[in-house]
């Protein structure tokens, strides 16, 4: 006899606002609603496209996620958006899918599918969501550079973001200091994520960045500079001093790919939009937050945890972080497939479709669950008894139970994440 399933109110809503819930309703696995839910894991899963973090959580956010990736999908927001959790099984911002059932639309969190059909959802290689994929956008410096145009020397204004920050740090003009403070609030904090084994109750977090858009002069901070000691860093950190002169600053352009192992000090600078695949974890330790005041007070710092988690020894070169795409498949009529990152935590692949390379074939039985994020153009996705067009800014979760599928496009790019 099939085991009964109990759907608690944390699971299903048949109201778009989430106000009407199935409460403690005991439903047999053989019931039509359960069969409909399980059947979802044999088709592409389309997450709600507005899975955004609120400004209080990501106060450094900008407008690019809405303007460049979501507005044409009918999504608007009056708030800045720092993060869009595109492929997520994390309880903080889980993906929610729609299921048409008996004349209504159910809003189905990924946790329901994970409970009902974990093998069809994840595949044979894992029993929970193995990765998390976000689009991040840090606020722009363009308006501040315009404000500074007649206030500082042109050769200073032409500097990259980090060098401009350093140049402005010694300026005592009240107007310039106020502009500088606003500029710094567009950077993400200097932070680190723990390695496996650093803490019993805090999972590791290794991640990668694919730069989607970058303002001129924008960049990232990655790793300690040559010659900086653990003791020097700790003294400045505990004094609340600016830590960025101790880190490598790297100017970036669209298309660049970086791999950030857990334990690496880093920060995302202003003026960037990037895709971030990572381990399913949100453990972040802040070492420095630019003097930011958010919701009326400074955000919490994690100084002891930073000291425990950071890798202090080893290679300090920036070349270790940058990944060079490796073309693994290119033939007439087929897509251009490039491996961007292939590590034990996840694999990241870029699929390019153009008039002479217009079709990609995949098999989620072989790979397990996949995440697809469309960063350019439109695509058509085809599978057994399934065909649908997707647009730039949409993401697709490919469950293991789908199996064979194909993607067609002519001027399109998508990023694929697998375990």
Name each model-derived stretch.
Residues 237-286:
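Loop-centered beta-sheet repeat module
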Residues 358-359, 377-382:
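Short beta-strand segments in beta-sandwich/barrel cores
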């Amino acid at each position: 006899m099939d085991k009964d399933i109990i759907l608690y109110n944390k699971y299903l809503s048949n109201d778009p606002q989430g106000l009407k819930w199935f409460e403690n309703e005991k439903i047999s696995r053989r019931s039509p609603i359960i069969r409909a839910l399980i059947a979802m894991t044999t088709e592409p899963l389309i997450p709600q496209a507005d899975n955004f973090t609120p400004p209080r959580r990501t106060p450094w956010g900008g407008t690019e996620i809405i303007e460049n990736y979501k507005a044409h999908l009918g999504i608007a927001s009056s708030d800045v958006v720092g993060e869009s959790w595109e492929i997520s099984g994390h309880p903080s911002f889980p993906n929610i899918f729609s299921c048409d059932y008996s004349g209504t639309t159910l809003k189905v969190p990924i946790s329901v599918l994970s409970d009902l059909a974990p093998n069809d959802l994840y595949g044979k290689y894992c029993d929970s969501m193995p990765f998390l994929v976000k689009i991040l956008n840090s606020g722009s410096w363009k308006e501040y550079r315009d404000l500074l145009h007649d206030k500082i020397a042109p050769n200073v204004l032409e500097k990259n973001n980090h060098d401009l920050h350093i140049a402005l740090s010694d300026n005592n003009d009240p107007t310039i200091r106020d502009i500088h403070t606003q500029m710094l609030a567009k950077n993400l904090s200097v932070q680190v994520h723990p390695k496996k084994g650093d803490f019993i109750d805090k999972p590791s977090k290794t991640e990668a960045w694919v730069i989607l858009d970058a303002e001129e002069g924008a960049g990232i901070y990655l790793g300690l500079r040559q010659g900086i000691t653990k003791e020097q860093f700790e003294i400045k950190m505990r004094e609340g001093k600016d830590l960025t002169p101790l880190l490598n600053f790297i100017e970036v352009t669209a298309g660049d790919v970086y791999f950030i192992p857990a334990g690496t000090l880093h920060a995302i600078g202003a003026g960037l939009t990037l895709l971030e695949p990572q381990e399913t974890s949100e453990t972040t330790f802040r070492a420095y937050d630019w003097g930011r005041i958010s919701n009326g007070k400074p955000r919490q710092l994690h100084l002891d945890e930073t000291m425990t988690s950071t890798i202090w020894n080893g290679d300090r070169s920036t070349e270790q972080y940058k990944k060079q795409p490796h073309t693994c498949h290119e033939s007439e009529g087929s897509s251009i497939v490039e491996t961007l990152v292939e590590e034990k935590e996840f694999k990241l692949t870029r699929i390019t479709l153009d008039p002479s390379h217009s079709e990609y074939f995949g098999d989620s039985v072989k790979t397990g669950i996949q995440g697809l994020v469309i960063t350019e153009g439109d695509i058509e996705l085809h599978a057994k008894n399934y065909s649908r067009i997707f647009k730039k800014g949409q993401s697709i979760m490919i469950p293991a139970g789908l199996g064979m599928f194909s993607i067609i496009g002519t001027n399109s790019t998508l990023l694929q994440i697998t375990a």
